[in-house]
Amino acid sequence: MVIVQMCFQNRSFAKNLILSFSCFLFTNSFNKGSVSMKRIRQGCCDFYRRLVRLLFGFVALWLFVSSLVFTSYLPYNEISWICSDYTVLLCLLFAVLCLALLQYRKIPFLQKGQQGRPLRIARWGMILCAGALAIWWVGFAGLLPLTDAKWTRESALGLLQGYSYWFENGSYMSIYPHQSGLALYQYLLLSVFGQDNVICFQYINCFAYMVILWAMGEFSYLFGMKDRGCLAVTILGILFYPLMFYVTFVYGTLLGLALSMTGLLLAIRFCEKGGWHRAVFSALALSLAVMIKPNYEIFVVGVLLYLVYSGLMKQNKGVLLPIFLLLVGLMAATRLPIKIMEQLSGCTLNNGYPTSTWLVMGLTDCEETSPGWWSNYANDTYAQSGKNAVIQNQIALEDLKAILSGYLRNPFSFVRFLVLKNATQWCEPLFHALWLNNVMMLCNETPMPQWAQEFLSTSNQYYLAQGLSVLQSLIYGGLVLWAWVPSPETRKDSEDLLAVILLGGFLFHCFWEAKGQYTMPYYVLVFPLAKLGYERLKLHSADSIRESCNPLSGKVRWLMPLLALLAALLMAYAMREPLKETLEMYKEIM
């Protein structure tokens, strides 16, 4: 009980405890003379693999059913409207697509599709065209940063101009010291490109956008897809055009995702082919991603689990190198920027708002905001405590205890809360992107052309979201196929790396502050898995389906997508009146 309490109160203690146990198990598993250790090693690997795929399967079902039933819209006031979707049509579309793919092997000319260099050239051409469009949008829009993006920039700019107001006690950086990495990055950019230069950050985002599109295809290659499959995944990334609109967001979202995906690719390559340089650059890329945006720690945890799993499966002590480098890099990424900022500003940065305040916000069903989204709770309790983090933590822990007690007394209210909260952050097809551009446009001193204003308007976002909700449902449907439908070919261990990262992101944001811009990286990351789900479905023949259905577990796995469609239809029917009423109200306020 004491150990559990210490883990809750001290995250570093919990991390060290887990890592110590993992290292003990990991180092002892290479004792080739011990049969018992081999059994333990194999048992741990099997348990981990099955647990990840089972949990991911249920998360995929949750997301798929939610996307079929709900579409969340985000107007200017940033309060989500959870409305009905075209559930019947989406279910029919998914069913028809799956049936068509099962007939794929019976159509000979589809098997003779072109592969090789022309498709690779086409893929690179599409990436460059998408990047050129992003560069044009940055130059055309001329959008300036707001809120956190603005305040981190102002903090860096202040240091260059010789004042440290933003770092003093009670100011922005003392409250949010985890933004030190982003502020340091801004400081370096402003030092090199000039203090009035905002567009350099946005152009770097354009390059990061192209890296993300490239990385999607590279994951597809690693998972066994051929050139057509890789091109299809890249096209999916381009069709998800909200990703491109993130280039104007002067924040660590795009660059952190590009670095993280590059780090994942290098880690997978290291486990397959070795090479110390891959370990070094993987750790470097992931550490920089965490420095710029701490949320990418979940990616690092996923890579660490993958490295331990790969090392145990292959009895490869070489993975100790990237594990060590990642741990060192993680410590440096979370602590070094704070120390540098303290040195530059001459101020001491505290720990900021306690973790408990974010958990209270993430678990509060507040009528004034969306469920689990940002509220003024942290600011209010900070003022109430006299800017004392210890007292604020005590207040937040009491409130957290009351919230959890209420959910324990009424578990249905907690389930309802999670359904609505996750609908706002996982079933908003635009993932905050156009909302960010619209708000920045409305706050701009220079007005944009009328057509651009209409394109970014709340009313037009409604129609764009309806179109993208189809793509979103198909993506989540592909994840269901990947997780549940038996595969006619051996799955690669590296596929589970993406699965465990999405799983971690989903669970984390069930309890943490919700926002579409936070969940977008996980959504983009699993595009290759979604395509792989459809890709493997079309490899099935009548014989392979009968063979996979022989054990009872095989029948259950084939039934899961059908049960998901049935659950979506029943939910949509049960909630048709309130969802329809909400949709009509939203149309009126537009």
Features from the language model and the residues they span:
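Extracytoplasmic catalytic/substrate-binding loops of multi-pass membrane glycan-assembly enzymes
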Residues: A141-L157, Q161-D196, L349-N351, Q392-A396, ...
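Membrane-interface transmembrane helices that cradle and orient dolichyl/undecaprenyl
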Residues: F223-G224, M261-A279, G311
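Short acidic/glycine- and proline-prone juxtamembrane loop motifs at membrane-interface regions
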Residues: P242-G256
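Membrane-proximal stem/loop segments at transmembrane-domain junctions that anchor or position
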Residues: M341-E445
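Start-transfer (signal-anchor) and selected internal transmembrane alpha helices
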Residues: L17-W136, L320-V328, S553-A564
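Membrane-interface anchor segments at the N-terminal boundary of transmembrane helices
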Residues: E78-L92, I199-C200, K421-L502
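Transmembrane-helix motifs of polytopic, lipid-linked glycan transferases
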Residues: Y203-G224, T262, G478-V485
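Transmembrane-helix signature of polytopic, membrane-embedded enzymes
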Residues: M216-L239, R491-V500
